[in-house]
Amino acid sequence: MPHFIVECSDNIREEADLPGLFAKVNPTLAATGIFPLAGIRSRVHWVDTWQMADGQHDYASVHMTLKIGAGRSLESRQQAGEMLFELIKTHFAALMESRLLALSFEIEELHPTLNFKQNNVHALFK
């Protein structure tokens, strides 16, 4: 953990530069000191069928979720979230100026007991 998951409307696939966003998100999350680098995973789910608002324009949307394990303070989660959303807004600023675009971001804390995982990548970063 954490997992940074993007749901993005397919009409901005080229302009969104999600590999570029992920290249910024992963080290930013690691730099907080509360997320181990080996557990950070970023991915996108492209949405090819959607409707926004009245459906009368070429709207685009990007919804992002950061799924994290339980146990971090509200203050540290809020600081990480605010820092990450600033990075997100900067990444999408030019696109926001050129088209109708909705950005949203949330942090989801997973249940401390009902969260199962195994990862041998952590050993590479010890």
From Swiss-Prot:
E.C. code:
5.3.3.10
Q: InterPro entries under this entry? A: 5-COMe_2-OHmuconate_Isoase (IPR004220), Tautomerase/MIF_sf (IPR014347)
Isomerase among the record's keywords? yes
GO molecular function annotations of the record: 5-carboxymethyl-2-hydroxymuconate delta-isomerase activity
- Record keywords: Aromatic hydrocarbons catabolism, Isomerase
Enzyme class, broadest EC rank = isomerase
Q: Which residues form the active site?
A: 2 (proton acceptor)
Entry annotated with the keyword Endoplasmic reticulum: no
Please, one GO biological process term? catabolic process
**pH dependence as annotated:** Optimum pH is 7.6.
Quote the SUPFAM superfamilies the UniProt record gives: Tautomerase/MIF
| Associated pathway | Aromatic compound metabolism; 4-hydroxyphenylacetate degradation; pyruvate and succinate semialdehyde from 4-hydroxyphenylacetate: step 4/7
What reaction(s) does this enzyme catalyze? (2E,4Z)-5-hydroxypenta-2,4-diene-1,2,5-tricarboxylate = (3E,5R)-5-carboxy-2-oxohept-3-enedioate
**Do you know which NCBIfam families this protein is assigned to?**
PRK15031.1
Q: What functional role does this protein have?
A: Transforms 5-carboxymethyl-2-hydroxy-muconic acid (CHM) into 5-oxo-pent-3-ene-1,2,5-tricarboxylic acid (OPET).
What quaternary arrangement does the UniProt entry report?
Answer: Homotrimer.
Name this protein carries in UniProt: 5-carboxymethyl-2-hydroxymuconate Delta-isomerase
Provide the gene name from the record. Answer: hpcD
